A protein has these predicted regions:
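Beta-strand-enriched cores of mature, soluble protein domains
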Residues: 21-124
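Bacterial N-terminal signal peptides that target proteins for export
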Residues: 1-8
Length: 124
């Protein structure tokens, strides 16, 4: 009987834990297309500046202050800032916190941005 209880408990835990690992991100999506306007390298990483267009935020100016992971030459963390001005002249700004990885010559960033319009954007 004790084995039956353990089996039922194990099954319940396995079934419940799999739903905790799955979630769906919903909401508005948009792409940012832009141009790198500056790169400054340091011994610990560097700073990248870019300008582009980002959906409802209009023309955006972005900065990534990147640090290297001491155990990997192809990943690290970053902080940054962003500012956008839409077609109506409205200005929004935000703080960026995230991680990055490099594959060949392409750097991909993943961040959570806290924006002055009250949104918290999950960015890739």
């Amino acid at each position: 009987m004790a084995n039956l209880y353990r089996s039922v408990l194990a099954l319940a835990l396995l079934t419940g834990s799999s739903s905790l690992l799955a979630f769906e991100i919903t909401g508005e999506t948009f792409s940012v297309e832009g141009t790198v306007t500056g790169v400054e390298l340091t011994a610990d990483g560097g700073t990248i500046n870019a300008v582009g267009n980002a959906g409802r935020y209009g023309k955006v100016f972005l900065t990534w202050n990147m640090t290297l992971n001491p155990n990997s030459d192809s990943q690290g963390a970053f902080t940054g800032r962003g500012m956008g001005i839409d077609d109506d002249g409205n200005r929004e700004a935000g703080s960026r916190y995230g991680v990055w990885r490099r594959s060949g010559t392409t750097i991909t960033t993943f961040s959570l941005d806290d924006v002055t319009d009250g949104n918290q954007n999950l960015c890739r």
